[in-house]
């Protein structure tokens, strides 16, 4: 088992449904601790920078528009195998394919408005956490 950190973003669709607390409860029940958090409205520049890896993909502009359409809740999570544990909680990217009881199955509307983002690797998690949080803002507990 490895203690890891991962980045999680509760997207505008889930924030609008007022389920932040419910999602946080799922993180904690799964052994993931919130070690940094911020509630904010992403700027276009922040969203484009964060999703730059997808810039050439056909869905890039729609993704950016969605991510700036309302506030998001951004958190760094820490725990044993946090990247995989968080992705298991999220479920499949397309909520139609997500297992019952996962965050996306319960709260997502579509593959585009899919409730949450989760880092896909330990390496990407480190970069993504650093994108939104200064080292002094991430505090283990």
Curated annotation (Swiss-Prot):
- Entry keywords, A to Z: ATP-binding, Cytoplasm, Kinase, Magnesium, Metal-binding, Nucleotide metabolism, Nucleotide-binding, Phosphoprotein, Transferase
Keyword Nucleotide-binding part of the UniProt annotation: yes
Record's GO cellular component terms: cytoplasm
Catalytic positions are: 117
Q: Which GO terms describe its molecular function?
A: ATP binding; metal ion binding; nucleoside diphosphate kinase activity
- Origin superkingdom: Bacteria
- What CDD domains does the annotation carry? NDPk_I
Q: Which GO terms describe its biological process?
A: CTP biosynthetic process; GTP biosynthetic process; purine nucleotide metabolic process; pyrimidine nucleotide metabolic process; UTP biosynthetic process
Which SUPFAM superfamilies has this protein been placed in? Nucleoside diphosphate kinase, NDK (SSF54919)
Q: Binding of ATP: at which residues?
A: 11, 59, 87, 93, 104, 114
Compartments, as annotated in UniProt: Cytoplasm
Q: Which reaction does it catalyse?
A: a 2'-deoxyribonucleoside 5'-diphosphate + ATP = a 2'-deoxyribonucleoside 5'-triphosphate + ADP; a ribonucleoside 5'-diphosphate + ATP = a ribonucleoside 5'-triphosphate + ADP
Q: What is its EC number?
A: 2.7.4.6
> Would the keyword Cytoplasm be found if you checked this record's keyword annotation?
yes
Which prosthetic group or cofactor does it need? Mg(2+)
Q: Which PANTHER family match?
A: NUCLEOSIDE DIPHOSPHATE KINASE (PTHR11349)
Subunit comment: Homotetramer.
Per its database record, what is this protein's job?
A: Major role in the synthesis of nucleoside triphosphates other than ATP. The ATP gamma phosphate is transferred to the NDP beta phosphate via a ping-pong mechanism, using a phosphorylated active-site intermediate.
Q: Which family does the UniProt entry place this protein in?
A: Belongs to the NDK family.
Q: What is this protein called?
A: Nucleoside diphosphate kinase
* Gene label: ndk
